Amino acid sequence: YSWVAVRPKRGPLGESTRWPELSSEYTTKIFPHTPGPSGIMQDGTLQFSDSISWPITPFIGTLGTAPDREVRASIDGQGAWGGNLDMRDAAAGNRILMPVYHDGALFYLGDLHASQGDTEYTGTAAETCGTVRLYFELIKQKKLPFVRIEKPDALVAVQTARPLEVAVDTATQHLMAWLVDDYGFTPTDAY
């Protein structure tokens, strides 16, 4: 099973006068999962209703290392160390590179999702439970400015900032440096 909650006044439509029910009460919907061909949920489906379902695409919503400085909340917040990123790219088969600031990294994870659109508009995705198997490798003498994700077909430079334009600009600069420094691109080709 997974569940989604709609928090009052949350997201871009939370203050909507057209849909006042989005700002009135906290509501929760529970979705059954159907196992896939392998007999497990990882390749199964999420049943929204009798007529609507979609593939389960599990990923880790919150993962990070202990921050380099004292922060208000490293689990719910975000920063160069990771945190509550809620990115579908934090999934099986992808390599996640994270800065390490302390001996032992003090890695943490949680907030497993069965699926999610492009963000958590309502404050939640399809929240679920599961088992996560990880392999860690320490890359010495490597300083990362932020979390990076290597997918089989793409590189993802992660950045969180407000306003959005600052995050996009900083992620672009980090991706440029990554392509130039690690992959030998010229700045023009990387851009």
Model features per residue range: what roles?
Residues 156-191:
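C-terminal alpha-helical interaction appendages
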Residues 58-165, 176:
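Conserved mixed alpha/beta catalytic, RNA-binding, or beta-rich assembly cores of soluble enzyme
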Residues 1-19, 146-165, 171:
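Short, surface-exposed loop/turn segments at secondary-structure boundaries that line and modulate
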Residues 8, 101, 180:
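Hydrophobic/aromatic-lined pockets within catalytic cores
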Residues 25-35, 127-133, 166-167:
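Short C-terminal domain-edge/linker segments immediately following a structured domain
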Residues 1-91:
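Intrinsically disordered, low-complexity linker/loop segments enriched in Gly/Pro
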